[in-house]
C-alpha cells in the first residue's frame, strides 16, 4: 500500500501518481475507504461519502457458539438497525446508528492510523435495546469489548459501487 497523490486522466486510461511512482492503467477503482472523498476529488468527482463514528461490541465466549462446527452467517436486522456475526467463539453486534455522528466530513486525515474513537453508548441506546431484544443470546453473554471506529458511509447507507457517470474508466467501490 502507498498513498495516491494524483489521478490524471489520459487518452487511454489513467496515470495514478503515488508516493512510489506513477502507474499507468486503463481503469481506476476508488476503494480508498476513509480517504475515498479525497481520492475522488483528485479525479474531479465529489463522492457523497464521509466517515462516521461506528460502534460494535464483542461478546465473551458463548458455549453454544463455541460448540459449532461451522461459522454462523451474518444476520442483518434492517428494522432494528443492527447486524450480528460470529467473532471467534462469541458474537459481534454492530450498530447502524440512527443518530449518527460525522467524524471527519471531508475524509480522514492522510496520517490517520485507524485509532479508535471514544465510545458514546448513550447515543446508541435505542439500537442496543432493539439488538438485545432481537438476539436473546446477548442478554446472557458478557460484553468483552466495545469498539467505536471510523467507517465511511453514504447518505442513504448504501454502497457506492460501479462506474462513475461522466468519468470514463473510473469506478467506485466506496462505503461498503
Language model regions located:
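Extended catalytic-interface subdomain
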Residues: 73-108, 124-125
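Flavin (primarily FAD) binding-site architecture
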Residues: 30-45
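Short loop/edge segments at beta-strand edges and connector loops
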Residues: 1-2, 18, 145
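Short, hydrophobic/aromatic-rich segments at coil-to-beta transitions
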Residues: 12-16, 73, 169
